[in-house]
Design a protein with these regions (language model features):
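Acidic, low-complexity intrinsically disordered segments
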Residues: 1-255, 261-262
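Radical SAM enzyme core and accessory elements
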Residues: 2-7, 30-31, 51, 57-62, ...
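Short, electropositive alpha-helical surface patch
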Residues: 283-290, 377-396
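A structural preference for short, hydrophobic beta-strand core positions in alpha/beta folds
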Residues: 38-40, 140, 300, 368, ...
Length: 537
């Protein structure tokens, strides 16, 4: 039996990827002397299987059962039982929603935990642990906690980065502390308390995670960002000294080596807000990797203006093993770029994209993200961007575009992470003239441009996506599909060598919903329950 049991889902719909945040919290919990079990893949977890896990893991010593909201559906607390298709700017949320809707055609998907959370029909899940131990606490956390703060049968909701707050709560529940907590816990949203040091931290997995060699795990090298883009609502932006949140090289090396020796892991999502925020950081990582007996491949967020200012970073990233990267380009309208804190001229950014593609080659996927509806952006300037994206030599393999994400000021914003734009949108003529839930998202503006509303921006984004479809390269061997223990998909290098036609035939022949369910059961839930039940005999 365990002091803490935590549930999470896959970051990408129906692919065998672990929800990193819960494993990070679990590592911190164990480092503070508590036992913790993480349960992944909640979207393949029916209530019957959930009961088996709770029966085998909850006992008198259990202090809390927690549920991460990060990869759940977006929903409005004000509309119980209903959920949104998309929050502006969050394309993963849209994919989750569409995928889960299709899944409800399958009997095994109608009653899984993620669907039940989204429909506010999760009472039996939340109530069941207390039938075994009435004293334990039911706790929510994660990036969408504010979308689920209305749920009944929840004792506490933790907002923000939770390493320190989780330990504070556990110390209270275990009797180590007399601190009093309200239902909503947010006293250290940025995990700045001096009771821990991120630089000394590591995320460790256990035999109860049943990790397989083909899986892609997540790595944090640093935390936070020294930039402060106007649209960004991440909690640790604008940090002056990023080295205060950069892991020590020995910690990174040990984490990579342990994952390789125990699980055979060589693929990673590096989730730093800006992986290339300094050349020194990349040089440190090169030294770490040269000291390891294996190479890694990884996906990361990068800034193109930093590659332009420090071109040596292009070669450093290649040596490190970059395989996929995402650039938040936002716009090629130079006046718009300056407004949001990305003022480098578009011509220089484009030149750097060409240089990166030349050095990295076609086996590295470059994705660019764009926002529609920024100040000064017009339909004509956006058309210039689309025409460039359609050029045969465009260095971007994939381009995604979404309406500008601004949230109307309201009382609930105290729980909702907000950006500079969210707090100052009137400065550029944005307004929210409509009431109700939909009105919280549907901005309008009259600034002399001809993109004047969220609805119009969404229509332009949809039309652009369709127009660019035949110009985009389809990912082959991406880190999501190659995390399956599938005879063809698991070998990323082989799928990269396939022709586009052969790869299309392969992926079109696979029911990924069924594959996800079958593999998580065969390779995870069945052996996990066997091991848990064996421990209790």
């Amino acid at each position: 039996m365990f002091n803490v049991i935590l549930f999470t889902d896959a970051p990408y719909p129906h692919h065998k990827i672990r929800g990193y945040g819960v494993h990070r919290i679990a590592s911190q919990i164990r480092a503070n002397g508590y036992t913790c079990l993480v349960i992944d893949f909640s979207s393949a977890l029916t209530f019957d299987k959930y009961k088996e896990i709770i029966d085998a893991s909850v006992g008198p010593e259990t202090l809390m059962v927690g549920y991460s909201t990060t990869w759940l559906r977006y929903r409005w607390p004000e509309l119980p039982g209903e959920f949104t298709n998309q929050i502006p700017g969050h394309h993963i949320g849209e994919q989750h929603e569409l995928s889960h809707t299709k899944d409800e055609q399958h009997d095994w998907r109608k009653d899984n935990m993620v669907v039940k959370f989204g429909k506010n029909e999760v009472e039996e899940f939340l109530q069941y642990p207390k039938t075994i131990n009435p004293k334990l606490k039911i706790v929510l956390g994660g990036a969408k906690a504010d979308f689920y703060m209305d749920l009944q049968n929840v004792d506490h909701v933790i907002f923000g980065i939770a390493e320190t707050m989780t330990i504070d709560l556990l110390d209270k529940l275990s009797g180590k502390s007399k601190r009093i907590f309200n239902k909503f816990i947010d006293h250290d949203r940025k995990a700045h308390a001096d009771t821990w040091d991120f630089r000394e931290s590591s995320t460790r997995y256990t035999e109860l995670d049943f990790i397989q060699p083909q899986e892609t795990l997540t790595l944090e090298v640093g935390r936070g960002c020294r930039f402060k883009c106007a649209f960004c609502n991440f909690p640790l932006i604008g940090q002056k000294n990023v080295n205060d949140y950069l892991k020590y090289p020995s910690k990174i090396r040990d984490e990579l080596l342990e994952n390789y020796e125990r699980w055979g892991t060589t693929k990673y999502f590096i989730v730093d807000d800006t992986f290339n925020d300094s050349t020194e950081k990349l040089e440190m990582m090169v030294k770490v990797m040269r000291d390891l007996p294996f190479k890694i491949k990884f996906w990361c967020y990068t800034r193109i203006d930093l590659l332009a200012a420090h071109p040596e970073q292009i070669e450093l990233l290649k040596e490190l093993g970059v395989a996929e990267t995402f650039f938040g380009l936002e716009t090629f309208n130079d006046q718009s770029s300056k407004t949001i804190g990305k003022g480098m001229p578009s011509s220089r950014r484009k030149d750097t994209l060409y240089r990166a593609k030349e050095v990295w080659g076609d086996r590295v996927w470059i994705e660019g993200g764009f926002m529609i509806g920024l100040p000064y952006e017009t339909q004509a300037s956006w058309r210039n961007t689309v025409d460039w994206l359609k050029q045969a030599d465009c260095p971007l393999d994939i381009s995604t575009c979404y309406p500008v994400n601004i949230v109307k000021k309201s009382e609930r914003n105290q729980w909702f992470p907000t950006s500079w734009f969210d707090n100052n949108y009137e400065t550029f003529g944005y307004e929210f003239p409509h009431d109700g839930i939909e009105g919280m998202l549907a901005w309008e503006k009259n600034d002399g441009t001809d993109i004047n509303s969220f609805i119009q921006a969404q229509e332009i984004a949809d039309a652009t996506t369709k127009e660019l479809a035949s110009y985009q390269r389809q990912r082959r061997g991406d880190f999501y599909t190659s995390s399956f223990n599938h005879p063809l998909l698991f070998d990323r290098e082989k799928t990269l060598d396939m022709s586009q036609t052969d790869y299309n035939k392969l992926v079109n022949s696979i029911d990924f919903n069924q594959l996800f369910f079958d593999h998580t059961n065969r390779d995870y839930f069945i052996p996990l329950l066997k091991l848990l039940k064996g421990r209790n005999v």
